[in-house]
UniProtKB/Swiss-Prot annotation:
The lineage of its organism: Eukaryota, Viridiplantae, Streptophyta, Embryophyta, Tracheophyta. It comes from the Eukaryota. Belongs to the DEFL family. This is Defensin-like protein 85. Disulfide bonds join 29-66, 33-51, 39-64, 43-65. Keywords: Antimicrobial, Disulfide bond, Fungicide, Plant defense, Secreted, Signal. It is found in: Secreted.
Length: 80
């Protein structure tokens, strides 16, 4: 039972870190989110943003992550 729990924990860890290693998370997230309002302002043209915490090398770091919505009303051209 303990071995299967450890295996499951390892699999979840791998699934969470693979996108970060490959650059999928780091492309839309930057380190140093001080407030959600500031992150939303920085990511306004991408559909807003949010603060996300992640544990990297044993330390918890907070990132500002942009939504990257391609159909955001702010970033989409107006069609009349």
């Amino acid at each position: 039972m303990v071995a299967s729990h450890r295996l499951l924990t390892l699999m979840v860890f791998a699934l969470l870190t693979i996108p970060m290693i490959s650059g999928l998370i780091s492309d839309k997230c930057t380190e140093g989110c001080k407030s959600t309002i500031g992150c939303n302002t920085r990511c306004m043209m991408r559909g807003g943003g949010y603060c996300e915490s992640a544990k990297i090398h044993g330390a918890v770091k907070i990132f500002c992550c942009c939504n990257n919505y391609s159909n955001s009303p702010i970033s989409s051209p107006v069609i009349n």
